[in-house]
Each structure stands twice: as structure tokens, then as C-alpha cells.
UniProtKB/Swiss-Prot annotation:
It comes from the Bacteria. Belongs to the pseudouridine synthase TruB family. Type 1 subfamily. It is an enzyme of class 5 (isomerase). PANTHER family: PSEUDOURIDYLATE SYNTHASE TRUB1 (PTHR13767:SF2), TRNA-PSEUDOURIDINE SYNTHASE (PTHR13767). It holds the Pfam family TruB-C_2. It catalyses: uridine(55) in tRNA = pseudouridine(55) in tRNA. Responsible for synthesis of pseudouridine from uracil-55 in the psi GC loop of transfer RNAs. Its EC number is 5.4.99.25. It comes from Xanthomonas oryzae pv. oryzae (strain KACC10331 / KXO85). This is tRNA pseudouridine synthase B. The active site is at D47.
Amino acid sequence: MKPRIAYRPLHGILLLDKPAGLSSNNALQAARRLLRAEKGGHTGSLDPLATGLLPLCFGEATKIAGLLLGSAKAYDAEIVLGVTTDTDDADGEPLRERAVPDVSEADLQVALAAFIGRIQQQAPIYSALKQGGEPLYAKARRGEVIDAPVREVEVQAIEVLGYSAPRLTLRVTCGSGTYIRSLARDLGEVLGCGAHIASLRRLWVEPFRAPQMITLEGLATALEAGAEAQTVLLPIEAGLADFARIVLDAALAARFRMGQRLRDAAFPTGQVAVFGPDGSPSGLGLVDADGRLSPQRLFNGLNEISVC
């Protein structure tokens, strides 16, 4: 019988390089077991086929996981033209094969231009979006007819990295909720031949533009060699880099952590990250036009429990 894992309070962010073939939740649980972290969450699913950056939040850092979910992201996608699948990627069953037309790079640029900016995009039927309280993929696996939702998403940029028919490689920078599988599927229809994702790698997630990622194997090796968790975890404040910053003195920081509102005309308006005099994050707040700072998410126990 295997000994039970002794989990511990642990606060920080792990920039995991997710392997292909593993769901985001399974990747999270594997990292959580290795770190022996009591509480963890990821910041938005990567498809099992996809690799690359999956920020994992542990302990008090889970309170900002939803904020990272809404961040901009970038991907490298290899697309195969001429074949559609039921999942819109290589993990699915082929549905239809069509001849790939003679497409020049200029033709590609014209076609891709329609997908840049704010666009309406229909989610894949094999997705984690819920309908009637159930993920779409569960309905799809039962063979149910699904009317996947159409949502507005934003694509900031698409760069052609390479094209040799039938394979096309793109770099896509996009906002939250964008499905690269849907983009590939829809591009294939515009070109008249269909398409699916062959491989997908997430390069970065705001604010981690140049992430030093670690694999599960690398994490296991480092911990077995005696590395402390703080050498592989980023502090919570690393995830707050895009927020306006307010530093309070000890008395005001204590009041803020107790949930009290504060007022100062010098406070920047909007959502802010609040820090104590020692530089440790106290939480997130919202400042209105009158300079009133209202606590939104408070970080607890960071001074009492170190990342170790």
C-alpha cells in the first residue's frame, strides 16, 4: 500500500510546460502531487493535444487564476488542410477529405485577414464549454446533436510561419476564449477544403511573455534532487504585473486585509494590486472615481507560511 501524501500549504505560480496527451486537470494534479500542495488550480484549459504554457496556481495564488484565464495568449499552430475531423484536431475521427486548392501566400493573407480583430466564432463541439450544466464534449461523445455557442472573440495577430501544402504553420496572438481549433476549421472552409489542427503549442500567457517553463519530468527531477519549491514557483506578485500598484503603510495594509475600505484621491482608478510596506501582496482591490479602494480578493497567510 502506497503511503499517503502529506500535503502542505503552498503559495505561488508554476509555469508548466504541459505535454501532449494529458488534460490540463491531469497535469495540474500531477504537479500538485509532486509539490505536495494542498490547493491548486489552472488558469484555463489547454487541449490534450496541445503543449506549452499552462500557469498553475497554488494556495492563495488560486485567487488570481480567473484573472489569468482572461489574459491574452499566443500559440504556434500546425494546420493540415484538406481534412476535417469531429474534434477539429488530429485526435478526432476524419469526417471529410477534399482537394487542397492551389493557394499562394497572398491568398492566405487575404483569407487570414477575415479572422483578425473582433470576430464571431463558434466553439468546437468537443470543448469544455457547458450547456445545460454539462460540458459539450460529454454530449458529443454520446452522439447528441449539438448547437455549439457562437461567441465574440478577439484575434490580435496571425503570422504565417510556413506553408507547404497541405501543412500550414501559424502564430496566433489572441484574447481569452479564442479556440485555435475553430480558427483552423473556419479557415479551411474559407479556402474551400476544410482543415484541422495537427499540433498546437501555447507560447505565452499575459503577464508571462517570456516564460521559463518547467516540464513535469523536470519538476520531479528538481524536487528529488532536493530543490525547494520556491525555486520552481513564482511568487503571487508575478501574476499581478499588469495591475496598477498601490503600496500601503502597515496600519492601512492591516485595515485593507480586514476588508475595510480606504480612500485617497491619489489612488489610481480601476482594479489594483495592493501591497504592504514590506512588498508582500495584500490583495486585489477596486478604486472608484472618488478614490475609494474596496477590497476584492485578499491574500491570507503569506507572511505566516513561506513557499517551501
